[in-house]
Amino acid sequence: MKNLKQAVSKIINETEIFDIHTHLFPAEFKKYHLSGISEVLNYHYLIAELFTTTNINIKKFYKLTNEERSNIIWEELFRKRTPISEACKGVLTILSELSIDYMSKSFDEIQSEYCKLNLSDQQIFKISKISQVVMTNNPFDKSEWKLFKNKNWDTNKYLASLRLDDILMNLEKCLDICKENIDRFDDESDLIIKYLDKVYEESRPVYAALSLNNLQLKSFLKNKFIPDILKWLERKHIPLSLLLGVRRKVNKDFLLAGDGIDKIDLYYLSEICNQYPNNKILCSCLSLNDQHELTVLARKHQNLKIFGFWWFMNQPSLIKLILNLRIELLGLNFIPQHSDARVTDQLIYKWIHFKTLLSNVLFNHYNNIQIKNFKISENQISDDVSKLLYNNSQNFLNLS
């Protein structure tokens, strides 16, 4: 095919995206919905960079308003220094995509221009070619769960997932909330399952999720509630999503910006897949050290699907390396990316950056088989890209 590179890029940029893991909330849920340039600058990626780049007083910084913090971050990371990190480049991509001239301007000037755009979440979805996003919803947070008490928001765009970390980390709180909602139960396990039935009916989640460090992963199958939860997930035909390798509060003073990487033994992931072959397992690992083994495991377990480049893995140099590895070992049988966005505007840069990398990687693979006399067509490329950005997620979540 002539103009292969241009064809791949065009198809990728025109394909609708299913974003399988975010922390977004609809605009109607104002307490939790985050949007705008101030929220983008106040994200913990940039806060951690600020703390380690300057000698700023951390406690005083956290007492400031969002706008005051944003001003400091803009001055320190974008005006006094070259904004060359991936987190900084993300901000520049958003501003550039929205045609905001940011050079030599203060935060207040940029904020003023940004606010004039008055972007809705639906407009950002359109800019980013996002068809649907999966939220992260904690059924053991009463305030957050109010989202499902009044569904005056687009339930087709925003899909639910159940974040179950509190069952492992804050059991007494979970049991108290379950008891407030369930009158009759046989034992604690029955209580939890009946509560999960209730929140399932309220939210219609597409998967349940857990974020685990290595100790939690090793003890996962020994937890007395896990067998019943996995059986419940099987009955509901929804996967379990495992985010593996976070080490919380590496630096407690940094608060949300203080989490780091834990060493993971993926033997225990393989055991979960073996012991529960009828449960679908989504998995993303935080450390580069785990990516090769994780990819090999995805070749060995039919019920395991890799997704995305999570958090510290979401760096262009690492994405290029591991994206090639996954294609070489798995073909197109994986979910290449999720945004992990907490601020709606982050969708713009997260997906622009990834699509550029995906385009280059796919072109090289297509060009390689074309040299070997395989005739690739635009229809095939379009089908492949749709699988990667949309259909693989839909199929694994039983939504298609």
Please place each PLM-identified region on the residue numbering.
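Metal-cofactor-binding active-site regions of metalloenzymes
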Residues: K2-K231, K236, N279, T295-S400
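Extended hydrophobic/aromatic segments used for targeting, binding, or gating
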Residues: W145, L162-M169, K252-N274
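Acidic, glycine-rich loop-and-beta core segments that form the ion-binding/anion-interacting portion
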Residues: L215-Y268
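Aromatic-lined glycan-binding groove of carbohydrate-active enzymes
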Residues: L240, S284-K300
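Active-site proximal loops enriched in glycine and acidic residues that flank catalytic Cys/His/Asp
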Residues: L242-R248, C283-S287, G308-W310, Q337-A341
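A general structural motif
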Residues: D259-Y268, C285-Q291, N314-I319
